[in-house]
Amino acid sequence: MLDRDGYRPNVGIILTNAKNEVFWGKRVREHSWQFPQGGIKPGESPEAAMYRELLEEVGLLPQHVKILGRTRDWLRYEVPTNWVRREWRGSYKGQKQIWFLLRLVGRDSDVCLRATNHPEFDGWRWNDYWAPVDAVIEFKRDVYERALSELARFMRGVESHHAYLARTSTQSEQ
């Protein structure tokens, strides 16, 4: 389902742990990593879609997480034409997303990447809060930075993106 501008309604999930690290999933049979995300079905609320995607992609139930916040508005990214299915070219531009910030209140062992017959991820790890901005595929970077920046206000002890960049560039120079 596309909106009139050619964007597919979607939810993005930033799952955090008690150390303010974020869940980072490795796509099945690929070398790319990303946050869990997925489409919103007709008649489904963004929150309901988030819980469905969380179960499908990460194997977590609502009792395993606490919602800390969500983005106020849709965040959009365009998908390069060579990434778009041939039958969608001309009508599909990209994704528009509502992002949710969650805290894992369960255990790491509650994560189950094989909760469905069609897993999205075949590996996962915890990452520094800002690390995904530089690690995700280029066309998603702006949305990742905007989502993490907007939702950082719900986190205690998370440094600014600028401070993170300064710290990590200093560490890499040593």
UniProtKB/Swiss-Prot annotation:
Keyword Hydrolase attributed: yes
Cofactor needs: a divalent metal cation
Locus of motif Nudix box: 38-59
UniProt xrefs under InterPro entries: Nudix_hydrolase, NUDIX_hydrolase-like_dom_sf, NUDIX_hydrolase_CS, NUDIX_hydrolase_dom, RppH
PROSITE patterns, per the entry: NUDIX, NUDIX_BOX
A molecular function GO annotation: pyrophosphatase activity
Keyword tRNA-binding: no
Domain of life: Bacteria
Keyword list, A-Z: Hydrolase
Summary of the function given for this chain in its UniProt record: Accelerates the degradation of transcripts by removing pyrophosphate from the 5'-end of triphosphorylated RNA, leading to a more labile monophosphorylated state that can stimulate subsequent ribonuclease cleavage.
PANTHER family for the chain: ADP-RIBOSE PYROPHOSPHATASE, DIHYDRONEOPTERIN TRIPHOSPHATE DIPHOSPHATASE
UniProt similarity note: Belongs to the Nudix hydrolase family. RppH subfamily.
Name of this protein: RNA pyrophosphohydrolase
Organism of derivation: Chromobacterium violaceum (strain ATCC 12472 / DSM 30191 / JCM 1249 / CCUG 213 / NBRC 12614 / NCIMB 9131 / NCTC 9757 / MK)
Gene: rppH
